[in-house]
């Protein structure tokens, strides 16, 4: 008959094995969640490639998909910065409009050097971000209300200074640097977006700023008690989002060679859809750079494939709207599951 000590040892060993099995299953579930969206993207490419091999898999179409969404990638990456800190920025698409319009007005209409027009465009984004932060942090207004109002104001301001006509004739130097010049057959705009993605990934993963954003987003009071300057972090996140939106506006102007009174406004819903869908991939439960990039291209791949199959243009709104609802729901589920698994 085994002794009491031997029996206790066997029990402890069984408990340890059970714990390892549970952790292994949880980690396997986490891995599956992390790669589910990339796998779905690959599956969508294969399906549409089989259905429309002559058009969908053409180098021209693939290059178009990668380059045309560079602006959305930059906007969505900007959006996840305040989202990580627990704030919304509904003015981000309007800042794209402001930036593109300033480049067009100053360069094409007034004849300013393109570099100076771009500098003013970034200054415009900086000012919007600073005002957003001041209203949210210093006065205490909810970021949703502030940025909704700011976005509406900026849109009206652009229509006031630029009129209702499309402004064309932007310098060829910008157009060449964004959409004409290519590397490996893909316009440079795609690579600019990937540089932003790498920088965002590095900041979120390896810097104190990224860790502070995450802590503030998880609990502002806990962050404050930990010595983090919560107001500065939130303010900085709104400024960073506006600066990236300004960069996206410059890319928008370079891509089209013009700016209209609505340039970039259509990016708001897709950016939110990509941000929340991306929070379910790569690093599930967190807004993250590569998940956002994959989400952008997953969504546009689906839309492009459906349109090549004959779907009408309204499928884009249906797709993005449904994706946003699904992504937010799934993101909440993943966060709750991670919280339960970590407990």
Positions of PLM-derived features:
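Transmembrane helix-bundle core of multi-pass membrane transporters
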Residues: 143-207, 233-236, 255-264, 315, ...
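Single transmembrane alpha-helix segments in multi-pass membrane proteins
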Residues: 45-110, 134-141, 275-289, 322
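Cytosolic-side transmembrane-helix boundaries in multi-pass membrane proteins
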Residues: 1-46, 218, 225-232, 302-343
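Hydrophobic alpha-helical transmembrane segments
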Residues: 34-39, 65, 73, 94-98, ...
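Transmembrane alpha-helical segments in multi-pass inner-membrane proteins
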Residues: 245, 256-321
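Short loop segments and helix-boundary regions at transmembrane helix junctions
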Residues: 26-29, 83-88, 109, 126-168, ...
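Hydrophobic core segments of alpha-helical transmembrane domains in multi-pass membrane transport
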Residues: 37-49, 79, 151-158, 192-202, ...
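Helix-loop-helix "hairpin" substructures at the membrane interface of multi-pass membrane proteins
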Residues: 93, 112-113, 117-121, 127-132, ...
């Amino acid at each position: 008959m085994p002794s009491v000590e031997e029996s206790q040892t066997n029990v402890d060993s069984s408990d340890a094995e059970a714990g390892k099995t549970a952790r292994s299953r949880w980690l396997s579930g986490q891995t599956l969640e992390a790669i589910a969206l990339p796998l779905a993207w690959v599956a969508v490419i294969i399906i549409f490639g089989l259905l429309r091999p002559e058009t969908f898999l053409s180098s021209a179409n693939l290059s178009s998909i990668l380059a045309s969404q560079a602006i959305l990638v930059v906007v969505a990456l900007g959006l996840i910065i305040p989202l990580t800190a627990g704030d919304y920025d509904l003015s981000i698409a309007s800042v794209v409009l402001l930036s593109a319009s300033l480049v067009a007005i100053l360069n094409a209409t007034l004849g300013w050097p393109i570099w100076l027009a771009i500098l003013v465009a970034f200054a415009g984004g900086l000012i919007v971000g600073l005002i957003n932060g001041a209203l949210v942090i210093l006065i205490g207004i909810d970021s949703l209300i502030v940025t909704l109002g700011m976005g509406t104001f900026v849109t009206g301001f652009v229509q006031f200074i630029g009129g209702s006509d499309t402004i064309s004739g932007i310098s060829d130097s910008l157009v060449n640097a964004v959409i004409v010049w290519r590397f490996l057959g893909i316009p440079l705009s795609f690579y600019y977006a990937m540089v932003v993605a790498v920088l965002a990934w590095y900041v979120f993963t390896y810097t104190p700023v990224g860790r502070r954003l995450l802590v503030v987003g998880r609990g502002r009071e806990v962050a404050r008690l930990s010595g983090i300057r919560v107001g500065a972090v939130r303010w900085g996140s709104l400024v960073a989002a506006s600066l990236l939106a300004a960069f996206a506006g410059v890319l928008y102007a370079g891509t089209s060679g013009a700016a209209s009174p609505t340039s970039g406004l259509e990016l708001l819903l897709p950016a939110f859809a990509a941000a929340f869908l991306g929070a379910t991939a790569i690093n599930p439960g967190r807004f993250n750079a590569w998940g956002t990039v994959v989400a952008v291209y997953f969504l546009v791949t689906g839309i492009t494939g459906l349109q090549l199959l004959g779907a009408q243009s309204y499928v884009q709104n249906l797709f993005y709207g449904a994706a946003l609802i699904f992504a937010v729901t799934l993101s909440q589920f993943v966060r709750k599951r991670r919280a339960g698994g970590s407990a």
